[in-house]
């Protein structure tokens, strides 16, 4: 097959125009990948986004355009960007175009899958409703996650979204033996490094004993990696970090999703229930808005791209459960200036089955995870799915916390003394409930000094029922902070009482 190529006619930032005026081949299709080779042999992949006139295409670069000039040859690969799939990607770190970035041996690209593909057909979708319990009290009780659903973690800067995502990866890998794909979208490179180290330490990614012993001594010797052990890893990481151009940041979600789909759709009994983590979905939107103006689109509200809902919908529609397996998506959503009405988080809301909202005021109280129990919702908080006892307990907790919220204005103006005895009891009990919604995390052990815990649904319901019934009103408030079960709170209460 003859090589189909054009010549670069214009470069503006990360957008490249390629002219086919003087070549015999036809124009590449939308989403086709073009390959540009520098004089030093370095390869740049660009993705076709628009046809301009009869003989020019406009493409978005997946890496820096430094060193690119007019007149350079751009070869049409005749296919979209494709990701390597199969067991070979377990435990590996990849970039947006499927290249390894972990310094280990290269992958085979014989078995690949396009990052642009259609969602599953309607007849292949699964309709079963199953709960994914996380071992985190506040989530399992008040906003439980649907297996195969889409979950959003909403919060401003620095309230704990990434720590919560890392805890969920750890808990679900341990509890459900699930496979995880993590897409790092426009976040700090340091966080990606921390995540990899945490995953190696917790056994989610397996580099082998010899490497792990060296890592504990401060070494990072890739020659010590056991590749047989690596194949037993339970996660793949795909990164398009904040120092990369917007093309990479907007497409890396699709790259990660493609790998997750491949694991879900494996034939026979190998079909997986996959967890797909995105940190941060806002950066996907932000990258799209950066590229949008360069592509000549008129910006819409607050400067976002006019195609925001379309781009989000295309991606979210692919995250679904089939009869062969499921993809449960957990998406961190940065909320600009803590404003949930901003178009980016507001558009994301419409696709989700459950939302976990992290609140700065709760964070400032020292309650971690800083989940807002009144704003966090789930469509499966239903007695037909969870059972009557779970549903009743959750509703009682929410009613108590709502009443406490209403009383806070009165307390701020008049003080506790002006409340009725009944309202004083509500306040004292609600403060205990609020603190009992906190929990020590495995991923925070290093800086909190408190061992992490997973709490079963039964223990969670039992603990909150005892709180609501007043069985533990005699314990000091501090006894309920950063404990797992109600038994842990009683034990801590005894120690605190003994100290006083």
UniProtKB/Swiss-Prot annotation:
Stored CDD domains: ATP-synt_F1_beta_C, ATP-synt_F1_beta_N, F1-ATPase_beta_CD
Coiled coil recorded as keyword: no
UniProt-listed Enzyme Commission number(s): 7.1.2.2
Keyword DNA-binding: no
Coiled coil: none
Entry keywords, A to Z: ATP synthesis, ATP-binding, Cell inner membrane, Cell membrane, CF(1), Hydrogen ion transport, Ion transport, Membrane, Nucleotide-binding, Translocase, Transport
Catalytic reactions of this protein: ATP + H2O + 4 H(+)(in) = ADP + phosphate + 5 H(+)(out)
Described function: Produces ATP from ADP in the presence of a proton gradient across the membrane. The catalytic sites are hosted primarily by the beta subunits.
Family named by the database record: Belongs to the ATPase alpha/beta chains family.
Protein name: ATP synthase subunit beta
Organism: Azobacteroides pseudotrichonymphae genomovar. CFP2
């Amino acid at each position: 097959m003859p090589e189909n190529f054009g010549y670069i006619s214009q470069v503006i930032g990360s957008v490249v125009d390629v002219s086919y005026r003087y070549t015999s081949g036809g124009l590449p299709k939308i989403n086709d990948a073009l390959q540009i080779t520098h004089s030093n042999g370095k390869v740049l992949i660009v993705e076709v986004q628009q046809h301009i006139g009869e003989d020019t295409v406009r493409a978005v670069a997946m890496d820096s355009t430094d060193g690119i000039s007019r007149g350079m040859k751009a070869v049409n690969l005749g296919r979209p960007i494709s990701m390597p799939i199969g067991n070979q990607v377990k435990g590996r770190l990849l970039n947006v175009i499927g290249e390894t970035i972990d310094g280990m041996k290269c992958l085979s690209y014989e078995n690949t899958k396009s990052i642009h593909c259609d969602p599953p057909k309607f007849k292949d979708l699964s309709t079963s409703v199953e709960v994914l319990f996380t071992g985190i009290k506040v989530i399992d009780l008040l906003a439980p996650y649907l297996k195969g659903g889409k979950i959003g973690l909403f919060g401003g800067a620095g309230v704990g979204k990434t720590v919560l995502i890392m805890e969920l990866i750890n808990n679900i890998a341990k509890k459900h033996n699930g496979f995880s794909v993590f897409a790092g979208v426009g976040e700090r490179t340091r966080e990606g490094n921390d995540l990899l180290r945490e995953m190696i330490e917790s056994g989610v990614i397996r580099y082998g004993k010899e490497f792990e012993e060296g890592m504990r001594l401060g070494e990072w010797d890739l020659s010590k990696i056991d590749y047989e052990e690596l194949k037993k890893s339970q996660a793949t990481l795909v990164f398009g970090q904040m120092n990369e151009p917007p093309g990479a940041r907007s497409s890396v979600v699709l790259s990660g999703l493609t790998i997750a789909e491949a694991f879900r759709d494996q034939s026979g009994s190998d079909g997986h229930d996959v967890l797909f983590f995105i940190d941060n979905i806002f950066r996907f939107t932000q990258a799209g808005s950066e590229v949008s103006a360069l592509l000549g689109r008129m910006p819409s509200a607050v400067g976002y791209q006019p195609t925001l809902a379309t781009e989000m919908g295309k991606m979210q529609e692919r995250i679904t459960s089939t009869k062969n397996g499921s993809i449960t998506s957990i998406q961190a959503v940065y909320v600009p200036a803590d404003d949930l009405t901003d178009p980016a988080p507001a558009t994301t809301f419409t696709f989700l089955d459950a939302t976990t909202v992290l609140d700065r005021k709760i964070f400032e109280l020292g309650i971690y995870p800083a989940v807002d129990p009144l704003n966090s919702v789930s469509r499966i908080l239903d007695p037909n799915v969870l059972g009557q006892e779970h549903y009743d307990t959750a509703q009682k907790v929410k009613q108590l916390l709502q009443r406490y919220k209403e009383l806070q204005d009165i307390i701020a103006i008049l003080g506790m003394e002006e409340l009725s005895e009944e309202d004083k009891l509500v306040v004292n009990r609600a403060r205990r409930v609020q603190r009992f919604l906190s929990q020590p995390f495995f991923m925070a052990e290093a800086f909190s000094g408190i061992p992490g815990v997973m709490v079963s649904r039964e223990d969670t319901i039992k603990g909150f029922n005892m709180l609501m019934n007043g069985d533990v009103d005699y314990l000091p408030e501090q006894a309920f902070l950063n404990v797992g079960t109600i038994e842990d709170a009683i034990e801590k209460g005894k120690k605190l009482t003994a100290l006083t």
